[in-house]
């Protein structure tokens, strides 16, 4: 009997602590969602340039009655996020069909959604509130970047209830339209393993753009970087950025790596300037930036391809002895590859 009141007192303290924690961690749905339409109005999202086929397919999927959820799958840096966020820009500019003209695009912040969910049921409560909020909106579109992260996110130890399982019913009924993005590796290894979730999405392959598409994309973004760095980019410098980044930065993909080269070149010239006059970016400046990024000497980057290819077999035989047949086969393969025959 002597321990009864004490136990009650301790339990009261625990309840009070729990309620205090709940009051601290309680947030509105807007804290977990980012309104991309508002960001587009404030010019905080770059306009979508090119990618006509991918945009058309995405709009077709969004206009379906059910399973109207496009999934953008492509390598890192090919522009998946730009295609998804660019939808908000297209809506604001009125460049979309009537059926999705009045829609609002929201980006889900999964980190904020999970942060602070200490007790079982906190996470589910938050996500249910977000889903309920979206259902009340006029034609909402939910964008989840790196969508493979929702599988297992927020699940308690030993539990199977995560973001993906809570979203499935709303996605199946078409109550919420969702745009997802992920890489080929994550799609095959994680996302596609969850068949119940993956069949609710329609896959759109986002491949690396070719040279002409890259020129169109970067030429469209050129005024933004010129204004930011107070420089002028010539077509020759943009062409050099695409060609040299494609040649020497093999671990990354266009257009991201070419845009990075353009951005860093503008930054370099902006730092080195002695006055406020606009600097004209030339091919040599692009070559200097590529050299710094890849650690390849500028002389190697600026060397003429024709001369180096012409003397390739001879130069290899000078340093490799007793392997003439292998050297000839290798040099022939390189020459064929360079002219686009293999």
Per-range role (PLM):
Residues 1-342:
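AAA+ P-loop NTPase nucleotide-binding core of proteostasis motors
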């Amino acid at each position: 009997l002597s321990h009864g009141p004490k136990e009650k007192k301790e339990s009261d303290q625990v309840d009070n602590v729990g309620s205090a924690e709940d009051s601290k961690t309680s947030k509105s749905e807007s804290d977990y969602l980012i309104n991309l339409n508002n960001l587009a109005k404030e010019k905080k999202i770059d306009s979508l340039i090119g990618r006509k086929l991918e945009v058309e397919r995405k709009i077709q999927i969004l206009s379906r009655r059910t399973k109207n959820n496009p999934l953008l799958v492509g390598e890192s840096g090919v522009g998946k996020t730009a295609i998804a966020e660019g939808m908000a820009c297209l809506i604001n500019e009125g460049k979309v069909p009537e059926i999705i003209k009045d829609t609002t695009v929201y980006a889900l912040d999964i980190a904020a959604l999970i942060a602070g969910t200490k007790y079982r049921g906190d996470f589910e409560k938050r996500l249910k509130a977000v889903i309920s909020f979206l259902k009340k909106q006029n034609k909402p579109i939910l964008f989840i970047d790196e969508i493979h992260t929702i599988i297992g996110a927020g699940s308690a130890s030993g539990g199977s209830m995560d973001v993906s399982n809570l979203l499935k019913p709303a996605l199946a009924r078409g109550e919420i339209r969702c745009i997802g993005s992920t890489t080929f590796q994550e799609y095959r290894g994680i996302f596609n393993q969850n068949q119940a979730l993956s069949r609710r999405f329609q896959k759109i392959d986002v491949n690396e753009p070719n040279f002409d598409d890259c020129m169109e994309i970067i030429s469209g973004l050129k005024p933004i970087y010129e204004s930011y760095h107070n420089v002028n980019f010539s077509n020759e410098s943009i062409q050099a950025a695409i060609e040299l980044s494609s040649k020497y930065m093999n671990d990354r993909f266009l257009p991201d790596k070419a845009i990075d080269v353009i951005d860093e070149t503008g930054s370099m010239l902006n730092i080195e300037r002695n006055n406020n006059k606009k600097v004209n970016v030339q091919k040599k400046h692009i070559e200097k930036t590529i050299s710094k990024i890849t650690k390849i000497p500028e002389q190697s980057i600026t060397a003429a391809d024709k001369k180096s290819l012409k003397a390739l077999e001879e130069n290899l035989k000078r340093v490799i002895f007793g392997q003439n047949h292998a050297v000839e086969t290798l040099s022939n393969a390189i020459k064929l590859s360079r002219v686009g025959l293999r």
